């Protein structure tokens, strides 16, 4: 398979550099070739998006929703093939990837239905004979910049509400999810989305990112990726007074109190930490355990981690597959080397047959660290987790909040009073009791505090707030 751009309703081959894509589960397998774009492709995509925007906005929300509904049906029909392609491209275990594609189906249907929801408000006027109300209007041309770790769900939870609100989209996916992105765009072509409403531009951020962010037709940006890049995007958008949304890093904590159901806590924490090889912004990367239950919990955790099944992504039994790329592998292994030098290794998963030729990283749990250590403070984005002790609930909350990030946090307890205190006191955008830090539902707002997110939210009704502006209308009828 070879990547292509989809601009103005036409499939075009970029003229930039090429990258051969190898299966991270088996580097001997060539999955396809990615052709990178030049800045001229961004210019073309921006022009196409601007040309299409007025006509798209003129359709009713219900009419725009029909396209999303049709795309959902095609996505569901393509689920097996698309999930396999994504697993081969970026290494997510096939069972997880199938679930992600199905989440994309649900997202499309959810936002399609929003096309007939009543939105806006009627506001009483101080003057007689005046009707005053608000309505939502499109922003215009929106840039959607997406990561490789959720190559289907994240693009769709941005693109679907953007389109429903009447915006046109320039979509730049991550390099390591480019082939999957092409297949997703083909589904929108198949439902006969009007030319220029969605434009796919494959490219490297350091080559075409500036051209995209500086394009004069751009009205908004939605980004998911690293904190450093996100903060840079926020600064550039602010200079143009342009609406932006940045979902960035996380160092998510799970607190285990002395009255917790240890078996439940271990199962949830292992899932939160090691599913997707820890390559989630919501992954559990810190565990804070009350001192009196520390030994019991860590022994159960050790046993669970040592039993994790590592296997190629297409193996239905794979709990943990490879990390996505050589860069990811090198970064994660550098933190594992740090752990071996400066921490105590509580648990480490075993190697598995058939994993010699891929980017496999054995899951690792480190202890013996203070709260300021890089393994406790830095986002690793891999199957590495640190465990620290807390004296009591108050100490656990202090440790939980001791981070530049504030995306997600969880607490395991049977104490309802402490559960509610945690929901109030944990400084994170998503707080969960007796659940893992990952797994927020699509109909709920998604986002964090501090350096994890901008001051907007994705998914649910909150996404419609971002992708639209409020216009206040008044008419005198006397």
Where are these regions (language model features)?
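Glycine-rich loop-to-alpha-helix module at the N-terminal edge of alpha/beta enzyme cores
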Residues: 27-118
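ALDH superfamily catalytic-core signature
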Residues: 228-370, 433, 477
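Proline-centered turn/helix-capping motifs that create local helix->coil transitions or kinks
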Residues: 12, 109-124, 306-310, 344-347, ...
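Short, well-ordered beta-strand elements within core beta-sheets of diverse protein domains
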Residues: 31-37, 52-58, 144, 254-257, ...
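Conserved C-terminal structural/oligomerization subdomain of aldehyde/semialdehyde dehydrogenase
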Residues: 29-32, 218, 255, 309, ...
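Rossmann-like NAD(P) dinucleotide-binding subdomain of oxidoreductase/dehydrogenase enzymes
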Residues: 120-264, 390
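Residue-level signal for inorganic ion chemistry
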Residues: 9, 27-29, 49, 64, ...
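Hydrophobic face of amphipathic alpha-helices that form TPR/SEL1-like repeat modules
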Residues: 1-26
